[in-house]
Structures are given as C-alpha cells and as structure tokens.
C-alpha cells in the first residue's frame, strides 16, 4: 500500500513534538543526511534581524529574611504544595520556565515584594 504525501503529512501532524523529533533523527540516521539548514556565505543583502527573546525563565536566587512570605508567594505562583514550595524557597532554583515577558515580570514583582531575590533569564 502506497501512502500519498498528504497522508504522510497528516500522520506527522498527529504526532507529538517528541515523536516528530525522534522521526527526524531516525530519518537522518537512515539516509545519512542532516535536517540542519545549510549555511550560506553572507551575501550583500539586508542585515540579519535580531530576534527578541520571547520566553523567559524565572529563577529564585535568595529567599531573603521573610521566608514565610516568600513561601506563600512561591505557592501562589507555582501551585506547589507547602513542602515543595518550602524546599524550593530554601534551595532556590527555577520557578517558571518559558514564561512570557509580562508573566515573568509579574512573578518577579510578587516575589520581590515578598522579600526574595529573583532573576529573569
């Protein structure tokens, strides 16, 4: 049975991102090719547009002196349970991954008001 290109595209569209990445890797290995775009020498064209970062990671670096307030803020932001929020507050670490700029700034403001030191990366 021969599949049409449309059937193949539809089948790929139904897969998750991880499954598609595995498929690409398998195709690369099977046919000895790379899915990376070819690198061309810079021509006398317009300068490359610098893309603005759209996803940010919010990292708790220090809980400060108001640990209870920071734990409450961490719970509100992450939805974690009390123990998990306490552990994260004490150890520091990633609060939110892939947040929008507005969301990252909002989280930073809430935690800074509670007394924590927060970085946006």
UniProtKB/Swiss-Prot annotation:
Coiled coil: none annotated. CDD domains: Ribosomal_L7_L12 (cd00387). One of its GO terms (molecular function) is structural constituent of ribosome. The keyword Ribonucleoprotein applies. It comes from the Bacteria. GO terms for cellular component: cytosolic large ribosomal subunit. InterPro entries: Ribosomal_bL12, Ribosomal_bL12_C, Ribosomal_bL12_C/ClpS-like, Ribosomal_bL12_oligo, Ribosomal_bL12_oligo_N_sf. GO terms for biological process: translation. Pfam families: Ribosomal_L12, Ribosomal_L12_N. The keyword Ribonucleoprotein applies. Keywords: Ribonucleoprotein, Ribosomal protein. PANTHER family: 39S RIBOSOMAL PROTEIN L12, LARGE RIBOSOMAL SUBUNIT PROTEIN BL12M. Forms part of the ribosomal stalk which helps the ribosome interact with GTP-bound translation factors. Is thus essential for accurate translation. Belongs to the bacterial ribosomal protein bL12 family. Homodimer. Part of the ribosomal stalk of the 50S ribosomal subunit. Forms a multimeric L10(L12)X complex, where L10 forms an elongated spine to which 2 to 4 L12 dimers bind in a sequential fashion. Binds GTP-bound translation factors. This is Large ribosomal subunit protein bL12. It comes from Xanthomonas axonopodis pv. citri (strain 306).
């Amino acid at each position: 049975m021969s599949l049409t290109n449309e059937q193949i595209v539809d089948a790929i569209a139904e897969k998750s991102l991880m499954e598609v990445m595995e498929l690409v890797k398998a195709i690369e290995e099977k046919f000895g090719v790379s899915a990376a775009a070819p690198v061309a020498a810079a021509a006398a064209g317009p300068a490359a547009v610098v893309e603005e970062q759209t996803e940010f990671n919010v990292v708790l670096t220090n809980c400060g002196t108001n640990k209870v307030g920071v734990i409450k803020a961490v719970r509100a932001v992450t939805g974690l349970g009390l123990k998990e929020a306490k552990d994260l507050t004490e150890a520091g670490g990633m609060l939110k991954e892939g947040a929008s700029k507005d969301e990252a700034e909002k989280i930073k403001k809430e935690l800074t008001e509670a007394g924590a030191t927060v970085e946006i990366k």
